[in-house]
């Protein structure tokens, strides 16, 4: 155990090494600051169809994505590039039917639901515009359509402002 006098001397020494004088605090030349460049998220429309239902309250509950009216078996495309994280029927998402999810970086992910089939597998890189599956009506749906979600750190957000 350290005696109080030794501990006090040690603390005084440490504190004396941490003192910054005004002359040391002001640089004598230009300061270089490096900032990471982060591209804003921009999405392409994921299917050849029209918006049939938007994000927000619907039928007394929250609709967490966009519904796109599309003919059965037409291609559903990646709205931007990323890595497939899931494809198929997912536990906890039974109402969504056949699903594809894509991690697009920066905490953002995409979810495509009600597909009749998927064309991708987990771990696969997809380019923007590449087919991820075919439109269908799997899970809980009343007709063929694509349900499309944008998620930020797992939380659904309105994708509409991100379409370029």
How would you name each of these model-derived features?
Residues 2-55, 83, 121, 127-130, ...:
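Intrinsically disordered, low-complexity
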Residues 44, 69, 75-79, 112-113, ...:
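Small beta-strand-rich domains/subdomains or short beta-sheet motifs embedded
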Residues 48, 73, 81, 117, ...:
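ATP/adenylate-binding site constellation spanning eukaryotic-like Ser/Thr protein kinases
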Residues 48-78:
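Short glycine/threonine/proline-enriched tight-turn/helix- or strand-capping micro-motif at secondary-structure
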Residues 53, 70, 86, 114-117, ...:
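A residue-level detector for short acidic-glycine micro-motifs
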Residues 63-64, 79-119, 144-146:
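Zn2+-dependent peptidoglycan hydrolase active-site motif and core
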Residues 74-76, 84-85, 126, 132:
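Generic structural signal for buried aliphatic residues
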Residues 96-104, 116, 124-164:
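Conserved, short, structured surface segments that act as functional micro-motifs
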């Amino acid at each position: 155990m350290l005696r109080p006098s030794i501990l006090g001397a040690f603390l005084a020494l440490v504190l004396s090494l941490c003192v910054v004088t005004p002359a040391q605090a002001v640089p004598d030349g230009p300061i270089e600051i490096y900032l990471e460049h982060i591209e804003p998220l921009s999405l392409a429309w994921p299917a050849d169809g029209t918006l049939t239902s938007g994000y927000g309250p619907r039928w007394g509950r929250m609709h967490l994505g966009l519904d796109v009216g599309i003919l059965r078996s037409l291609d559903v495309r990646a709205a931007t590039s990323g890595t497939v994280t899931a494809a198929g029927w997912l536990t906890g998402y039974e109402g969504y039917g056949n699903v594809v999810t894509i991690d697009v970086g920066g905490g953002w992910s995409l979810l495509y639901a009600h597909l009749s089939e998927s064309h991708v597998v987990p771990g696969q890189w997809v380019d923007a515009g590449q087919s991820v599956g075919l439109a269908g009506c799997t899970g809980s749906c009343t007709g063929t359509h694509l349900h499309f979600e944008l998620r930020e750190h797992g939380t659904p957000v309105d994708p509409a402002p991100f379409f370029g």
